[in-house]
Each structure stands twice: as C-alpha cells, then as structure tokens.
From Swiss-Prot:
The lineage of its organism: Bacteria, Bacillati, Bacillota, Clostridia, Eubacteriales. NCBIfam families: EnoyACPredFabV, PRK13656.1. GO terms for biological process: fatty acid biosynthetic process. It comes from the Bacteria. Coiled coil: none annotated. This is Trans-2-enoyl-CoA reductase [NADH]. Monomer. It comes from Clostridium perfringens (strain 13 / Type A). InterPro entries: Eno_Rdtase_FAD-bd_dom, Enoyl-CoA_Rdtase_cat_dom, FabV-like_NADH_b, NAD(P)-bd_dom_sf, Trans-2-enoyl-CoA_reductase. NAD(+) binds at residues 47-52, 73-74, 110-111, 138-139, 243, 272-274. The record marks 74 as: Plays an important role in discriminating NADH against NADPH.
C-alpha cells in the first residue's frame, strides 16, 4: 500500500517502513564515518527503538562492535494499519547488524514487567554470558507495578501553581498562549512511579542477582534539565520530579554495584525533536529557536551525534561530569552564548515571524522523519509492504 502521514493531535498514527529504515541507515552511516570506540562488548538497551535508546543501540553495535540486546514495546503491522516507527527501526537495525555477521537480539514486550526481566536474563545467559553496559531509556505513559499490580499513569503538569506561556503548534506555525494546570499529589506520584528510578533499580537488582553483570559494569539513564524558560513545565513540573528521582537512583545503583566495581550514571542530554518532546507545550517552541541558534553557531547535534560523543567520552575516560556526578552532554545547548541568543529571541516571537526567528520548519521536518516521512532517497509514491523492512 501507499503510506502517508496521518495525525491524531500531536501523534502520527502511521509510519513508513522504508523511510524508517533510511533513518536508521543514516545514523549508522554517521557512526561509521566517525570511527570505532574501544568500549562496551555486550550491551543491554532498555527502550531501544526510538530516540536516544535507538542511538545507543546503534553506537554500541557499530562503533564498539558490541553484541546488543534491545528491549522495546512496539506495534506490528495489522491489516491496513502500519507498524509503529519503533518496530520498523528495530527490524532495520537487526537486519543490518546481522548482515554484518554481528549479534543483535530484540525483545518486544513490557520492560516494566517481571516476565520481560526474566526473559531478558535467560537470553543474556544463553547468548551473551554477562553484560558490561546497561542503557536505561524507557519512556511510557503507564507502568504496572510488578508487585502490587497497580497501574500508574504519568502526566505533564506543573507543581504548585498554574503556568502560562507561549507555545508553537508546529502543524500550523501558530504561536499560542497556553496554561498548564498543577498536578494533584496522586498525579505527581504516578509520574514518579512511571518515569522515576524505581524500575531502573529493579532491573539492576534483577540482573545482579542473576549474575549476568560483568565486573566493572556501567549503567546509564537519560535525563534533561534545560533552561529556566522551560522549568515550570519541565524541571519544576511533574516530569522534573520524576527525573529528580531517576537522578537520585544513579547514586543508589552505584552502591548496589560496588561489589562489581560498577557505576550508575545519569547523562543529561540535549533537547531534541522526539515523539515525547513534540507533545510538551513550550518545549516545542524552545527547541525550534534552539535549533536555529545552534545551527548558526555550527554546534547543533541530533540523537546519534549526542550518543556517539557520550560513548566516546565514557570509554576514553574524558567524561564531562558536573558537581552532582551527572554526565553533561547538554553542554553545547547550555553554553552561555546559545542561551543568551534564545533569551533575546523568545519575547519577540509571534505567529508572523516564527519561521524567520526560529527553525519551526525544521522542527516539523524532524518530527515527520521520526515516522519515516520526508527522508531523501525514498519514493513515497511507491507501494510498500508494511509488514517488513
């Protein structure tokens, strides 16, 4: 069938298999051009199908020549409904890696569940022995507590007071004012349960108990801080509370891994166009301005550039750590000259000048690329088989 983008709000409900494959190939090409990294050899990536998790799986496999086990929860094609972009991404990467004669194991299931943890541990024992790097990059709207069975939902709200600011509807290019209401205590706790560090710790404890962690193992979870203009909705909001919990967990994990000389890290990454960030009010406008400023300065990076740099710094003993022991790969975003330029543009921006003062057009293009649309070298008028890549 011919696949075109279809939308429900900020969610694209279709994905293009050949476009997703091309997107993965472009990232692989970047890694190959930039050379090998002497690092991890057996890697578990939790949340391996999109964004930073996908980039981590690609860098591990292609730069480090590591064996990779990737866990994700994606939708296969059914009837005339395409598979999710993440499903095509993982299939594309798996085919490519196996074509090179390397090992890539994929598990499609709920990483929050005990069942998937057990399945992954068995697969590590059978195929890899032990892992020396665990990447935690899960993003989900809900999580079922494996002990109590209670289902928790995450939400995107402020804490304490409502917050009004401007945001970008990137479909129309309109700048609108938006008010975000504060969360209840229950919503704050629900978001922490889904997006905090609890499940990361459960994974590390389960892997350690099963004796599948290598001596000197490292584990990294991804976070974001950003500038003050986004604080009320992000860092000081429900998501920020969950990220604080995630960051606190890194230190606790280092203690758990002490007997293995292991370490738990948080990597604070750059703001990028992802399925998650495009739905966050205010952040979409901030990213559009950020892209323009960083491109003009020649410092713009996407997921793959960020993660390649992080791996290189990690394994060459050159980590840029802050006072709280977090890896700062957001250093170029948070550079004083970049933030100053954004602060000057922010109050001036309107629906009339948004395309001149920001990279709103590119935000839209990058968003479409997440689902395999708008990539060079893909004929979108062709019939495609939606069940494979």
């Amino acid at each position: 069938m011919i696949v075109e983008p279809k939308f429900r709000g900020f969610i694209c409900t279709t994905s293009h298999p050949i476009g997703c494959k091309k997107n993965v190939e472009n990232q692989i090409e970047y890694v190959k051009e930039n050379g090998k990294i002497e690092g991890a050899k057996r890697v578990l990536v939790l949340g391996a199908s999109t964004g930073y998790g996908l980039a981590s799986a690609i860098v591990a496999s292609e730069a480090c020549d590591a064996e990779v086990l990737g866990v994700s929860f994606e939708r296969e094609a059914k009837g005339k409904r395409t598979a999710s972009a993440g499903w095509y991404n993982i299939e594309s990467l798996k085919k490519f890696v196996e074509g090179e004669g390397k090992k890539f194991i994929s598990v499609n299931g709920d990483a929050f569940s005990n069942e998937v943890k057990s399945e992954v541990i068995d697969l590590i024992k059978e195929n890899m022995g032990k892992v020396d790097l665990v990447i935690y990059s899960l993003a989900a709207p809900k999580r079922k507590d494996p002990v109590s069975g209670e289902v928790y939902s995450s939400c995107l709200k402020t804490v304490g007071a409502p917050f009004t600011s401007k945001t970008l509807d990137f479909h129309t290019g309109e700048i609108q004012n938006i008010t975000i209401n504060p969360a209840t205590e229950e919503e704050i706790e629900g978001t922490r349960k889904v997006m905090g560090g609890e499940d990361w710790m459960l994974w590390i404890e389960a892997l350690k108990e099963a004796n599948v962690l290598e001596n000197g193992v490292k584990t990294i979870a991804y976070s974001y801080i950003g500038p003050e203009v986004t604080y009320p909705i992000y860092r000081e909001g429900t998501i920020g509370r969950a990220k604080n919990d995630l960051e606190k967990t890194a230190g606790e994990i280092t203690k758990v891994l002490k007997s293995l000389n292991g370490e738990g890290y948080i990597s604070v990454n750059k703001a990028l166009v992802t399925q998650a960030s495009s739905a966050i009010p205010i952040v979409s406008l901030y990213i559009s301005i950020l892209y323009k400023v960083m491109k003009e300065k020649g410092t713009h990076e996407g997921c793959i550039e960020q993660i390649y740099r992080m791996f290189k710094e990690l394994y060459e003993g050159n980590l840029n750590l802050d006072s709280e022991n977090r890896i700062r790969i957001d250093d170029l975003e948070m550079a004083e000259d970049v933030q100053k330029a954004i602060e000057e543009i922010w109050p001036q921006i309107t629906s009339e000048n948004v395309f001149e003062l920001s990279d709103a057009e590119d935000f839209k293009k990058e968003f479409f690329k997440l689902f395999g649309f708008g990539l060079e070298g893909v004929d979108y008028s062709e019939d495609v088989d939606i069940t494979t890549v």
